[in-house]
């Protein structure tokens, strides 16, 4: 599949108010991706997650597998050790070639995300999108989480694994996401200050999460989210 882009120059405070973007960060097993898809149907706008990897591959000519290897995670155990020992500076990168390659892949994805925010209304799940679009005026950022027992139960059912294995997968995936965000955004992925608001998907359910986000979009951008129009 081919994707077309209008590569733009981005400056602080940009982002067309004729379209809007919702970014969703999520804990593994919280249902954040599913909430994004439900929201997409309700609002009539696309929801992007791993499609961004395909877009980045088409745009750059780099094999999609390269982007899959760094999908919200860092390559190499030395990265984890470096993250634990060295304070993160927003513009600081180590000299290892593998890390620089990862940084290049991230920058390509970031350009795709910025271009989407400039050209269409959409939902972006993960990919550090809240940070990438932090200076855009047309963006709402949401963090979705759920209690561990709820995440374990959901992963057990979804992947047909034991509770022990589900727990391991949650810890591993969330650790990857934490390190990824800390590296590229220079902050704590779970810090609520990074987002417009946070939601406990287990407390109120996915449907009500969708409704709350729609209400926030309506208030923030003065948009009728109950009767959206094409291209809004």
Where are these regions (language model features)?
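Small-molecule kinase domains that catalyze NTP-dependent phosphoryl transfer to phosphate-bearing small molecules
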Residues: 76-82, 162-206
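Short beta-strand-centered segment that lines the nucleotide-binding/catalytic pocket of NTP-utilizing
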Residues: 46-57
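Glycine-rich phosphate-binding P-loop
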Residues: 24-37
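NTP-dependent small-molecule kinase module
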Residues: 111-114, 183-232
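Conserved phosphate-donor/acceptor-positioning beta-strand/loop module used by diverse small-molecule
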Residues: 135-158, 163-171
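Short, Lys/Arg-enriched N-terminal segments with co-localized hydrophobic residues
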Residues: 1-16
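ATP-dependent small-molecule kinase phosphotransfer cores
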Residues: 57-121
């Amino acid at each position: 599949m081919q994707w077309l882009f209008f590569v733009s120059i981005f400056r602080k405070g940009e982002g067309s108010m004729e379209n809007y973007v919702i970014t969703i960060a999520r804990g593994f097993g919280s249902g954040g991706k599913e909430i994004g898809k439900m929201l997409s149907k309700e609002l009539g706008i696309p929801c992007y997650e791993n499609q961004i990897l395909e877009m980045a591959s088409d745009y750059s000519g780099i094999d999609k597998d390269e982007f899959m290897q760094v999908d919200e995670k860092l390559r190499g155990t030395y990265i984890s050790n470096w993250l634990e020992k060295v304070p993160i500076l927003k513009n600081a990168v180590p000299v290892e070639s593998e890390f620089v390659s990862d940084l290049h892949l991230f920058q390509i994805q970031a350009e795709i995300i910025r271009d989407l925010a400039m050209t269409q209304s959409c939902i972006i799940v993960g990919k550090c999108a809240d940070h990438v679009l932090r200076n855009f005026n047309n963006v709402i950022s949401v963090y979705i989480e759920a209690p561990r027992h709820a995440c374990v139960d959901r992963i057990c059912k979804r992947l047909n694994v034991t509770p022990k294995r589900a727990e391991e997968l949650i810890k591993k995936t969330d650790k990857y996401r934490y390190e990824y965000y800390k590296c590229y955004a220079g902050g704590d992925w779970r810090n609520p200050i990074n987002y417009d608001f946070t939601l406990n998907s287990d407390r109120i359910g996915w449907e009500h999460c969708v409704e709350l986000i729609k209400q926030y979009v309506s208030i923030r951008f003065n948009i009728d989210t109950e009767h959206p129009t094409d291209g809004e």
